[in-house]
UniProtKB/Swiss-Prot annotation:
This is NAD(P)H-quinone oxidoreductase subunit 3, chloroplastic. Its EC number is 7.1.1.-. Keywords: Chloroplast, Membrane, NAD, NADP, Plastid, Plastoquinone, Quinone, Thylakoid, Translocase, Transmembrane, Transmembrane helix, Transport. It comes from the Eukaryota. It is found in: Plastid, Chloroplast thylakoid membrane. It comes from Aethionema cordifolium. One of its GO terms (biological process) is photosynthesis, light reaction.
Protein backbone atom coordinates (compact mmCIF):
# COMPACT_ATOMS: atom_id res chain seq x y z
CA UNK A 1 0.00 0.00 0.00
CA UNK A 2 1.33 3.44 -0.95
CA UNK A 3 1.44 5.73 2.05
CA UNK A 4 2.11 9.44 1.66
CA UNK A 5 3.31 10.00 5.21
CA UNK A 6 6.42 7.93 4.46
CA UNK A 7 7.62 10.82 2.30
CA UNK A 8 7.41 13.53 4.97
CA UNK A 9 11.19 13.90 5.17
CA UNK A 10 11.43 14.18 1.39
CA UNK A 11 8.81 16.93 1.25
CA UNK A 12 10.43 18.78 4.16
CA UNK A 13 13.81 18.61 2.41
CA UNK A 14 12.28 19.80 -0.87
CA UNK A 15 10.55 22.76 0.77
CA UNK A 16 13.60 23.79 2.80
CA UNK A 17 16.00 23.43 -0.13
CA UNK A 18 13.67 25.53 -2.28
CA UNK A 19 13.22 28.19 0.41
CA UNK A 20 16.92 28.76 1.15
CA UNK A 21 17.85 30.30 -2.25
CA UNK A 22 14.63 32.33 -2.27
CA UNK A 23 15.37 33.69 1.21
CA UNK A 24 18.99 34.45 0.25
CA UNK A 25 17.85 36.57 -2.71
CA UNK A 26 15.13 38.23 -0.65
CA UNK A 27 17.45 39.16 2.23
CA UNK A 28 20.20 40.42 -0.09
CA UNK A 29 17.65 42.53 -1.96
CA UNK A 30 16.36 44.05 1.27
CA UNK A 31 19.79 44.74 2.79
CA UNK A 32 21.58 46.01 -0.33
CA UNK A 33 21.90 49.75 -0.86
CA UNK A 34 19.83 51.17 -3.71
CA UNK A 35 22.19 53.80 -5.11
CA UNK A 36 22.40 54.02 -8.87
CA UNK A 37 25.14 56.22 -10.25
CA UNK A 38 27.38 56.31 -13.29
CA UNK A 39 29.87 53.95 -11.66
CA UNK A 40 27.16 51.43 -10.89
CA UNK A 41 25.82 51.49 -14.46
CA UNK A 42 29.23 51.20 -16.18
CA UNK A 43 30.69 47.92 -17.43
CA UNK A 44 33.15 46.20 -15.13
CA UNK A 45 36.18 44.51 -16.61
CA UNK A 46 38.63 43.55 -13.84
CA UNK A 47 38.67 47.08 -12.46
CA UNK A 48 39.65 48.63 -15.79
CA UNK A 49 37.46 50.64 -18.12
CA UNK A 50 36.63 48.46 -21.13
CA UNK A 51 38.33 49.45 -24.36
CA UNK A 52 36.38 49.07 -27.59
CA UNK A 53 33.28 46.97 -27.88
CA UNK A 54 32.78 44.95 -24.70
CA UNK A 55 30.31 42.57 -26.33
CA UNK A 56 31.99 39.55 -27.92
CA UNK A 57 29.97 37.40 -30.28
CA UNK A 58 30.71 33.68 -30.66
CA UNK A 59 30.46 31.97 -33.99
CA UNK A 60 27.55 29.59 -34.54
CA UNK A 61 29.98 26.68 -35.00
CA UNK A 62 30.87 26.85 -31.33
CA UNK A 63 27.22 26.49 -30.35
CA UNK A 64 26.71 23.49 -32.63
CA UNK A 65 29.82 21.81 -31.23
CA UNK A 66 28.65 22.51 -27.67
CA UNK A 67 25.18 21.16 -28.45
CA UNK A 68 26.59 17.89 -29.79
CA UNK A 69 28.78 17.63 -26.67
CA UNK A 70 25.77 18.12 -24.37
CA UNK A 71 23.80 15.42 -26.21
CA UNK A 72 26.56 12.87 -25.74
CA UNK A 73 27.18 13.98 -22.18
CA UNK A 74 23.51 13.27 -21.38
CA UNK A 75 23.91 9.92 -23.12
CA UNK A 76 26.68 9.07 -20.67
CA UNK A 77 24.45 10.03 -17.74
CA UNK A 78 21.74 7.67 -18.99
CA UNK A 79 24.05 4.77 -19.85
CA UNK A 80 26.13 4.75 -16.65
CA UNK A 81 23.35 3.45 -14.34
CA UNK A 82 22.39 0.93 -17.01
CA UNK A 83 25.98 -0.34 -17.17
CA UNK A 84 26.16 -0.65 -13.38
CA UNK A 85 23.05 -2.86 -13.25
CA UNK A 86 23.53 -4.67 -16.56
CA UNK A 87 23.68 -8.17 -15.06
CA UNK A 88 20.39 -7.70 -13.17
CA UNK A 89 18.28 -6.13 -15.93
CA UNK A 90 18.36 -8.90 -18.51
CA UNK A 91 18.04 -9.04 -22.28
CA UNK A 92 15.14 -6.60 -22.70
CA UNK A 93 17.11 -3.78 -21.07
CA UNK A 94 20.08 -4.63 -23.29
CA UNK A 95 17.91 -4.33 -26.40
CA UNK A 96 16.46 -1.01 -25.20
CA UNK A 97 19.93 0.40 -24.48
CA UNK A 98 21.14 -0.87 -27.86
CA UNK A 99 18.29 0.96 -29.62
CA UNK A 100 19.08 4.11 -27.59
CA UNK A 101 22.75 3.99 -28.59
CA UNK A 102 21.80 3.25 -32.21
CA UNK A 103 19.58 6.36 -32.35
CA UNK A 104 22.42 8.43 -30.90
CA UNK A 105 24.88 7.03 -33.44
CA UNK A 106 22.45 7.94 -36.22
CA UNK A 107 22.28 11.46 -34.78
CA UNK A 108 26.08 11.63 -34.69
CA UNK A 109 26.30 10.55 -38.34
CA UNK A 110 23.68 13.16 -39.27
CA UNK A 111 25.57 15.90 -37.39
CA UNK A 112 28.82 14.79 -38.99
CA UNK A 113 27.36 14.96 -42.51
CA UNK A 114 25.81 18.36 -41.85
CA UNK A 115 29.22 19.66 -40.74
CA UNK A 116 28.37 20.33 -37.10
CA UNK A 117 31.64 18.73 -36.00
CA UNK A 118 33.84 20.83 -38.32
CA UNK A 119 35.59 23.51 -36.33
CA UNK A 120 36.87 25.60 -39.25
Amino acid sequence: MFLLYEYDIFWAFLIISSAIPFLAFLISGILSPIRKGPEKLSSYESGIEPIGDAWLQFRIRYYMFALVFVVFDVETVFLYPWAMSFDVLGVSAFIEAFIFVLILILGLVYAWRKGALEWS
